[in-house]
Amino acid sequence: GMPKVPNTWQELAEYAKIIKEKTGIAGFSIPTTNNCGGWIFLNIAWSYGVNFEEQQANGKWKAIFDTQEFRDALQFLYDLRWKYDVFPDNKVIDATEYQKVFYTKQAAMIITGPDNASGIVTQGGLNKDDIFFAKMPKGPAGRYSQMGGAARVFFSKNSEEQNDAAVKWLMEEGYTPFITPEIEKNIRTNCENTIEKGGIVFPKELFSQWESEDRKTKIEKIYGEYANVDIRNYENYMDFSDVIIRPEEPVLCQQLYSILDNVIQEIMTKKDADIDALAKSAAENFQKNHLDKME
């Protein structure tokens, strides 16, 4: 049968605990260094109702996350660590180690995107049919998922020649709202190369910003010819009906992530971590040392 996936963060905690108790494998893991912990944590925090920053009428930015919602989200992490004990032994890890924890079967669940699926299979030797993708668990304020990471943008100060080159590169990737014969050829070549390397080709795009039905039809026809995984393992993930897709915070994201990393590490490594103090100092730090210094 198909795996039973957690619909809420509370269910994730409970399922992760059961997995660890029955198998000895950590039920869940998150990164905690190099700004990756804060980056991943945004999804959890938003679902608890946290907003991190806000632009004031005078144009200045204000840290607004010294709130009960932020404390509740941190408490959830604390409970995962100290109440449910679901994490692997190594809890201070970067993004590379984070992926490794999963593909070496040291953790059953992680937060990642389908663009990492091929790497997980080719690097770690996992059976591609043993990977199941599900949408983000729901929190008290809803179900949030961060967009970004694979976005392509044009620099406003580009020359016309640079913009032309960028468009040609996007066409080479097939990252366009239309599919020409040349783009179709490139997509097919990419699929063949992925399969040759042992990676994953999905039967359809799992997430697309393009609304063109013609493009969708052509893409699904191409991918359908090369697909090498069971689409049922990804159907839950593809149901966006109740998912709020949200971009990263507007300004100084990396500085915010670094501060959140430190908070998460404190929670992971210290049972007597003071949630109230951590929340207050994190917001003050972000305001005083970063937002207030913006030009």
What does each model-found stretch correspond to?
Residues 4, 50-72, 123-125, 135-144:
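Short, solvent-exposed loop/beta-turn-alpha elements that line the ligand-binding surface or hinge
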Residues 7-14, 89-103:
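Short helix-initiation/N-cap motifs at beta->coil->alpha
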Residues 10-62, 78, 107:
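Extracytoplasmic/periplasmic solute-binding protein
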Residues 13-18, 59-91, 132, 136:
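Glycine-centered hinge/linker elements that transmit conformational signals in sensory
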Residues 21-34, 176-185, 288-295:
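Bilobed periplasmic-binding protein-like "clamshell/Venus-flytrap" ligand-binding domains
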Residues 23-26, 104-113, 129:
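Alpha-to-beta junction loops
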Residues 95, 112-120, 150:
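Beta->alpha turn/N-cap motifs
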Residues 120-127, 141-146, 150-259:
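C-terminal lobe and pocket-closing loops
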